[in-house]
């Protein structure tokens, strides 16, 4: 399979230093809203990268559920591979691939676990089917067949048919405290625009990176 000629030109315009705010969140919010307005599929989907104890990286797609000055939030099974990695190494990387609007955002940081109150508030806002699925899946564990997972789901669906679904003790969330955030805008002739915000003490440094 020859992939060498699969490429396209980027024509949507550049990104200039004078257009950047002093802090990264206003620009992220603007770009995310533009991704939503452009009807990009799953605009809040982000690649989450962690490393195991041997240094082997792993990636998976997770949905961003909230962001503010305190960090970026996502939820997961605390028995999952990503959670195990983060228990040994709190460093993490997030990546938003908004190809349709010729943009990417890359974030590095460290995680902290969310409080039980924050977890409960979000869990109870989920559809009941999703709440039950959280109970049914021992995420990242090997299973014999899909039928085993579906059978467990149906069993729990019957168990929780009446009343509320409690928050599993093995389910939680993380807040990513940002160390850096890079904004990438596609440019003509592969002269892409890249700016990185690096957090130092109480301020952000902004640097242009070569494409």
Swiss-Prot record:
Alphabetical list of InterPro entries matching this protein: Pyridox_Oxase (IPR000659), Pyridox_Oxase_CS (IPR019740), Pyridox_Oxase_N (IPR011576), Pyridoxamine_oxidase_dimer_C (IPR019576), Split_barrel_FMN-bd (IPR012349)
Organism ancestry: Bacteria, Pseudomonadati, Pseudomonadota, Gammaproteobacteria, Vibrionales
Subunit structure: Homodimer.
Molecular function terms from GO: FMN binding; pyridoxamine phosphate oxidase activity
PANTHER family per record: PYRIDOXINE-5'-PHOSPHATE OXIDASE, PYRIDOXINE-5-PHOSPHATE OXIDASE
Pathway listed: Cofactor metabolism; pyridoxal 5'-phosphate salvage; pyridoxal 5'-phosphate from pyridoxamine 5'-phosphate: step 1/1; Cofactor metabolism; pyridoxal 5'-phosphate salvage; pyridoxal 5'-phosphate from pyridoxine 5'-phosphate: step 1/1
Family: Belongs to the pyridoxamine 5'-phosphate oxidase family.
PROSITE patterns for this protein: PYRIDOX_OXIDASE
Cofactor(s) the protein requires to work: FMN
Role of this protein: Catalyzes the oxidation of either pyridoxine 5'-phosphate (PNP) or pyridoxamine 5'-phosphate (PMP) into pyridoxal 5'-phosphate (PLP).
HAMAP family per UniProt: PdxH (MF_01629)
Protein name: Pyridoxine/pyridoxamine 5'-phosphate oxidase
The protein's Enzyme Commission number: 1.4.3.5
Biological process (GO), any one: pyridoxine biosynthetic process
Binding site for FMN: 60-65, 75-76, 81-82, 104, 139-140, 184, 194
Catalysed transformations (reactions): pyridoxamine 5'-phosphate + O2 + H2O = pyridoxal 5'-phosphate + H2O2 + NH4(+); pyridoxine 5'-phosphate + O2 = pyridoxal 5'-phosphate + H2O2
Keywords linked to the UniProt accession: Flavoprotein, FMN, Oxidoreductase, Pyridoxine biosynthesis
Record: residues binding substrate: 7-10, 65, 122, 126, 130, 190-192
Organism listed in the record: Photobacterium profundum (strain SS9)
Domain of life: Bacteria
Keyword field contains Nucleus: no
Primary gene name: pdxH
């Amino acid at each position: 399979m020859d992939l060498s000629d699969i490429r396209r030109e980027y024509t949507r315009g550049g990104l200039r230093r004078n257009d950047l705010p002093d802090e990264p969140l206003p620009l992220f919010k603007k770009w995310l809203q533009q991704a939503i307005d452009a009807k990009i599929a799953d605009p809040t989907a982000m690649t989450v990268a962690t490393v195991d104890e041997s240094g082997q990286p792993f990636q998976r797609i997770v949905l961003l559920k909230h962001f503010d000055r305190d960090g970026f939030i996502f939820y997961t099974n605390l028995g999952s591979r990503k959670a195990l990695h983060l228990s040994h190494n709190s460093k993490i990387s997030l990546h938003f691939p908004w190809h349709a609007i010729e943009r990417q955002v890359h974030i590095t940081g460290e995680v902290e676990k969310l409080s039980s109150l924050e977890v409960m508030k979000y869990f109870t806002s989920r559809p009941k089917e999703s709440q039950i699925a959280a109970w049914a899946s021992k995420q990242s564990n090997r299973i014999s067949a899909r039928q085993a997972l579906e059978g467990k789901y149906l069993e729990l669906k019957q168990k929780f048919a009446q009343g509320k679904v409690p928050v599993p003790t093995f389910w939680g969330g993380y807040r990513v405290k940002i160390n850096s955030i890079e904004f990438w805008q596609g440019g003509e002739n592969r002269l892409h625009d890249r700016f990185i915000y690096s957090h130092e003490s109480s301020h952000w440094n902004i640097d242009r990176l070569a494409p």
